Regions:
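Hydrophobic alpha-helical connector segments
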Residues: 60-63, 74-105
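Hydrophobic/aromatic-rich alpha-helical bundle segments in the mid-to-C-terminal region
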Residues: 119-128, 140-172
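Short amphipathic alpha-helix in the helical subdomain of ABC transporter nucleotide-binding domains
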Residues: 8, 82, 86, 149-156
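Helix-turn-helix
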Residues: 14, 18-56, 60
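N-terminal intrinsically disordered/low-complexity leader segments
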Residues: 1-10
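Amphipathic alpha-helical packing segments from all-alpha helical-bundle domains
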Residues: 67-70, 75, 87, 102-105, ...
């Protein structure tokens, strides 16, 4: 049975929401397609027609989860002192509710140890998510107009995702 474009888009969103949550709760390797489709209320065929593979689901789910986290954190407000915004973001990140809600928490922290064993597409998606998180956090740094050298230092301190994708280290 053929589904409408709107229904296919809804199915895709359901799959990604279920996968993002399950991957954060259980890890990528421990989460099966059957678990994802059951949580999404769809069939295996629905998942494979949308994505083609579990790896493609994982890559897309990482990006969706990281964007959702970024929206939750919000953007830096130039009118607000950087330290105040940074304090708010760090407080949110380190809160007990964030810590205890692993399925809704930071996809980077939840999957960081899984990523080196994942296929290239998943590692690349993780690298993009790490870079996005760094760029977002850079907006809350006390000196928003940092030099390139300072920026490199921040990347070393906070991590830059290159460990997730060994090929990325050659790009910079």
């Amino acid at each position: 049975m053929r589904v409408s474009k709107q229904k296919a888009a809804e199915n895709r969103e359901q799959i990604l929401a279920a996968a993002a949550r399950l991957f954060r709760e259980n890890g990528i390797a421990a989460t099966g397609v059957d678990m994802i489709t059951r949580r999404a209320g769809l069939t295996h065929g629905g998942l494979y027609s949308q994505f083609g593979s579990k790896d493609a689901v994982a890559a897309a789910a990482i990006l969706v989860a990281s964007r959702k986290s970024a929206r939750r954190l919000g953007r830096p407000d130039e009118r607000q002192p950087a330290e105040q915004g940074l304090r708010r973001v760090v407080g949110q990140y380190l809160s007990t509710s964030h810590r205890d809600e692993r399925g809704r928490g930071c996809v980077l922290a939840a999957l960081g140890t899984d990523i080196p064993r994942q296929p290239r597409a998943v590692r690349q998606a993780f690298t993009i998510a790490v870079e996005g998180a760094f760029d977002l956090m850079a907006g809350w740094m006390p000196d928003r107009g940092t030099s390139r050298r300072q920026e490199k230092g921040y990347r070393r301190v906070f991590g830059d995702g290159r460990g997730a994708d060994p090929g990325a280290c050659c790009k910079r």
